[in-house]
């Protein structure tokens, strides 16, 4: 996950006060792992979506990615904002998240590229948190999932550091694909603080208002 100057750019003044809050949230996680992952019909139980609350500054490295690879940032408003969650899609999402977490070696951008922050597809098999998320989005889009329903998202993690994940918006809530865990959880059961995500209406980012979430115990 992003650290130092990199984290500061991604979070834009949202991080310094969150340590004690996260400690409380992580200790309080009360939902069961079974409830978080799958309902009786082979799909996750429905949960409340993550609501956006105005514009937010895009991470610098995302802007750089857009210059190098415009297609990674393009928004097609003709695509669905949310996808229908089916047993097949759920299995695909869970399997793909776990597979990419195994396939890609986690390395910092400084070790990988010699720079503080760079977003890119991990074509050489190495990457930071945002690179995992970009590849997951690409692979899911190749299966037919609406690109517009999959959003790069910046959070504050359990270590009070900036972190990037992929949010998949569905008719049963918003789910998080994360290189830190193989379980795919509803956004509000990850234990993270949600800072901002890509806009679904234009090339840009929207604020998530620092929404605080609880965590599900014993889910990896």
Question: Where are the model-predicted features located?
Answer:
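A structural boundary/capping signal
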Residues: 11-14, 34-220
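Bacterial N-terminal signal peptides
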Residues: 19-29
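Enrichment for repetitive, rod-forming helical segments
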Residues: 2-3, 22, 143-144
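Intrinsic low-complexity/disordered segments
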Residues: 2, 32-34
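Short, Lys/Arg-enriched N-terminal segments with co-localized hydrophobic residues
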Residues: 1-9
């Amino acid at each position: 996950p992003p650290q130092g100057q990199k984290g500061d750019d991604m979070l834009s003044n949202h991080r310094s006060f969150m340590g004690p809050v996260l400690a409380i949230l992580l200790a309080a996680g009360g939902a069961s792992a079974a409830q978080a992952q799958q309902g009786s019909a082979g799909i996750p139980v429905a949960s409340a979506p993550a609501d956006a609350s105005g514009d937010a500054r895009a991470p610098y490295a995302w802007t750089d990615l857009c210059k190098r690879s415009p297609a990674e940032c393009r928004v097609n408003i003709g695509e669905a904002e949310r996808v229908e969650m089916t047993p097949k899609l759920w299995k695909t999402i869970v399997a793909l998240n776990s597979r990419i977490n195994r396939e890609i070696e986690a390395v910092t951008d400084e070790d990988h590229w010699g720079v503080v922050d760079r977003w890119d597809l991990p074509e050489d098999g190495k990457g930071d948190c945002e690179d995992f998320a970009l590849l997951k989005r690409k692979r899911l889009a190749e299966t037919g999932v609406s690109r517009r329903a999959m959003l790069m998202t910046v959070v504050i993690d359990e270590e009070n550091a900036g972190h990037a994940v992929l949010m998949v918006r569905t008719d049963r809530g918003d789910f998080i694909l994360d290189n830190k865990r193989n379980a795919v959880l509803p956004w509000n059961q990850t234990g993270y603080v949600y800072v901002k995500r890509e806009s679904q209406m234009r090339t840009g980012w929207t604020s998530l208002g620092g929404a605080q979430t609880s965590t599900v115990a014993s889910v990896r």
